[in-house]
Amino acid sequence: MSRPIVAVGSLTRGGGTGVTPTVIALAQKLSEMQRNVHVVTTGAGTPRSIAYTDRAEEVGDEPLLIAAFAPTWTAADLAMGARAAIDAGAEVVIIDGGLPDSAVRADLGVLVESAVRGFGNGRAWPLGPLKIARDKGLSQADVLITLGPMRAQTDFESLPIPRVAARLEPLQTGMDWTGARVFAFAGIGVPERFFATLNDLGAEVVGKQALADHQDMTPALLTRLAREAAMLGAQMVTTEKDAVRLPPELRPHVLVVPVRLVPEDWTSLEVRLARLFT
């Protein structure tokens, strides 16, 4: 490729490790460095530029969410998507899902894993929880980001790869959640993590509904959730990723808790990003 490629992915099957927040954080950091960054993620067909006004059921919830932070493309062929982004003026391309085993050679490979879940037995499915064996996957990356509490980070200290400990934190929006009666619903990799975040913010979670990752927000489902929230006298609340799947008429009635990646130290990542342009 004629421009630097940053591949971001996870060895863990099933999602929920924090790849999307990492992609957003890297895109924001590159933008702060005055670089025109585009994001490419897997989708159907030829490369398509995503507008924030697109519908999630047509383009996917994660591409639609990322498009709020950087120009975003979907493509069945990630290499074609990267070329389309470069042709459109990208100075650097982040490939969401570019690890492991991508056909696109990356200038910087970033693995993202849950510090709590770890790598299990380190073996690939069906013998273990990973897409490919741990050591093979680590060999494809330049840096490993482990997301989770500090008490869970020590298990990764002996790995032969530069590592950045990080956590997901709610974005400070000025909303005071203390004592707020909420009905929470989430269709993400680990919905329980969202419910725990609300508890940590001081909200009173009087009802909750865990949905499947990327689950369709059908009228019947939303009617049921709204009815349950009303019966409990609670405010409906969900994640950023789920919010983009809501119909426009419902969005004003549902509060959203954005979360952002917070590394313990940005320095090593900033250095690696800067090297892409030297």
Language model region names:
Residues 1-54:
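Walker A (P-loop) phosphate-binding motif
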Residues 212-213, 253-278:
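Short, flexible loop segments at boundaries between secondary-structure elements
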